[in-house]
């Protein structure tokens, strides 16, 4: 079983943890993570955006938020994620998660699941996850992964 399968199977645990973090910092950080991973190759095709928005709406861990609001936020953040200057603002949203280790771990795991709803975890996406780990002061072992 691969890393993505392990994360997907941990859905109930992630949903329970996510309910602890019903705030804007968690919401914005998680969706920023998702957009940054989705934009890892420099583009986000309309089909990929639609698939990610659908995954956002169906993920139990994010049911504490309004699906439409999350989808709209993701679409906005996608534009930011491919613009090098606006990307820095997204990284700041991710860095805000660092003040709560469990929140940061949960957000990164959720972001990885959603952004990789196609089942492909590319080397570019892994590089972005490493950057996100650094931004939050976490390591691969904190997530239980090896990139």
Please provide the spans of the model-predicted regions.
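Small-residue-enriched hydrophobic alpha-helices in membranes
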Residues: 1-37, 43-147
């Amino acid at each position: 079983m691969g890393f993505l399968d392990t994360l997907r199977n941990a859905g109930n645990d992630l949903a329970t943890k996510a309910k602890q973090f019903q705030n804007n910092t968690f919401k914005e950080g998680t969706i920023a993570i998702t957009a940054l991973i989705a934009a890892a190759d420099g583009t986000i095709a309309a089909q990929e955006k639609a698939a990610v928005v659908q995954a956002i709406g169906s993920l139990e861990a994010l049911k504490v938020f309004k699906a439409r609001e999350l989808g709209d936020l993701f679409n906005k953040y996608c534009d930011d994620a491919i613009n090098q200057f606006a990307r820095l603002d997204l990284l700041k949203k991710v860095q805000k998660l660092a003040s709560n280790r469990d929140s940061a771990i949960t957000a990164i795991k959720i972001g990885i699941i959603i952004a990789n709803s196609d089942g492909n975890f590319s080397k570019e996406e892994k590089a972005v996850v490493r950057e996100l780990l650094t931004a939050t002061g976490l390591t691969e072992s904190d997530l239980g992964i090896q990139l």
